[in-house]
Amino acid sequence: MAAALARLGLRSVKQVRVQFCPFEKNVESTRTFLQAVSSEKVRSTNLNCSVIADVRHDGSEPCVDVLFGDGHRLIMRGAHLTAQEMLSAFASHIQARGAAASGDKPSASTGR
């Protein structure tokens, strides 16, 4: 998990909304993700990004909704994901969005 946290940043992210019901049993990974994204070190990578914690008491499924600057949206349902899976998916999408914004092709699509 340390590797996923080391490359975590909010450079191409416009908004992160984390929604969960704290009384459900499957919210630990979503809360860990929120804690990682809300840290001062990560938030300092993009001061214009808003991180919103939407805590509800309705038994809803934990969900992370990420809106990127280019309009791309990443939605992760946290009920069956670990915190490391969520952080690595988030980091890989940020890397892909950064490569798309700079005009480079992602390194995974180098085949002919």
From Swiss-Prot:
* Domain of life the protein comes from: Eukaryota
Q: Which InterPro entries match?
A: mtLSU_mL53 (IPR052473), Ribosomal_mL53 (IPR019716)
> Which Pfam families does this chain map to?
MRP_L53
* A GO term from the CC aspect: mitochondrial large ribosomal subunit
| First-listed, main subcellular location of the protein, grouped into a coarse class | mitochondrion
Q: Where are the transmembrane segments?
A: none
Q: Which UniProt keywords apply?
A: Mitochondrion, Ribonucleoprotein, Ribosomal protein, Transit peptide
Localization annotation: Mitochondrion
What family does this belong to?
A: Belongs to the mitochondrion-specific ribosomal protein mL53 family.
**Complexes and interactors:** Component of the mitochondrial ribosome large subunit (39S) which comprises a 16S rRNA and about 50 distinct proteins.
Q: What is this protein called?
A: Large ribosomal subunit protein mL53
Q: Can you name the source organism?
A: Bos taurus
Where is the organism placed in the taxonomic lineage, from the top?
Answer: Eukaryota, Metazoa, Chordata, Craniata, Vertebrata
Gene name for this UniProt entry: MRPL53
